[in-house]
Amino acid sequence: MKAGGFCISESHNRVILHGVMETLFYMRTPSPVGPLLFVASARGLVRLEFEPRAQKLDAKTTQLQESKKALAPYLRELNEYFSGDRREFSFPLDLRGTDFQLACWHALLEIPYGETRSYRDIAQAIGHPHAYRAVGMSNNRNPVAIVVPCHRVIASSGSLCGYGGGLDIKRKLLDLEQGTLNPGPPLGTSA
């Protein structure tokens, strides 16, 4: 069965974490950079992905509930970001990954709005100066695009490379942060 852009099993549609069932809320919405898929838990935003590239949610144990109301705080701040009125996000994140991935993603959160860093810079920031390729792989697995700003990571040469949403979207996000992208209609509305 498909729900919210990711696959779930008809007979196994619940997430069990530490013996407790968890509901994940989701919604799809258009944005200035293409359709987005939001997924949140009671603890925070779990995923923000570009719809055509949305990853499958672990199918065995996920209970999904479509809810614009549950995702309203995230939607509001993303609207402010796309309109140029927000440079940092204040809502909680529920990041799930390896210790190395979490270290990379936390380092990405330190990159200021409108600035870029190289993969090598991130590797050095997390204390693994030669692990820039592993940093690239962690960026590729970043489940919360835009908010955890992997679009701000570029090659050491200064060129754009590698982005889960595609280089066109990476360029648009960087242009937005430089004030050169038309924001388009608010999220959660029809285009």
Language-model features and meaning:
Residues 130-174, 181:
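Short glycine/serine-rich loop segments
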Residues 10-130, 176-191:
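Basic nucleic-acid-binding alpha-helical/helix-turn surface characteristic of O6-alkylguanine DNA
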